């Protein structure tokens, strides 16, 4: 980088020149990016372990929430284990899987960038998924995509048949740079048509920026998780007041192409069975 700065000062490189690199984050402990499914299952199994240790927690409302990927996970949990969900509070969660986070290297599309005046670094996170060779066990099939998608009409119908007594609240910027607002609108319209208590706060323009809760129109709108829950959690708890929340084992199956993904309680764990 110092060499680039020197060449610019000597007039041998254009002042707007950036050296372009890519880099891969490798999580500790052998972890990797599976995108969605494993993390959602882990959340449910953490809930099960918590209730096992503190049985009185079993009757409390089960509310999941977060921003961006965390919001997507909260909505995905409502898909794979709706019987363990009373409410979801989401900020800017995607509706369809972001391929940059799954097969970004195959597509030459980094998940995010670091940059300054002299360099542009495209960042990936370690994953085994690929679309380059379908003989590989980590080939990302259409079925793998379908199960991670929240916007699938047949899956939504199955989800609602198991439990549509879920309150869903979401914030999303109409100008989200990931171009996900239209999909989020379609999803929440489907939720409502299926009988859910679903509210989407679509932030359309600068007039809705208050500088305290909503700070801009970019992805996430700089809404902190703390502010999100401070605003929405009391309202959701009020709606849930008097409702009984149980820990009842169940299962749900989603046909995806030539495969069926079944999420099932087995020996105090939620497990995924693929047939």
Q: Where on the chain are the PLM-derived regions?
A:
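A conserved amphipathic alpha-helix that caps or lines the catalytic cleft of carbohydrate-
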Residues: 47, 51, 77-78, 188
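Serine-hydrolase catalytic core
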Residues: 115, 121-231, 237-238, 244-275
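Hydrolase active-site cap/lid region
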Residues: 79-142
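Hydrolases whose catalytic domains are alpha/beta-hydrolase-1, hotdog thioesterase
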Residues: 70-77
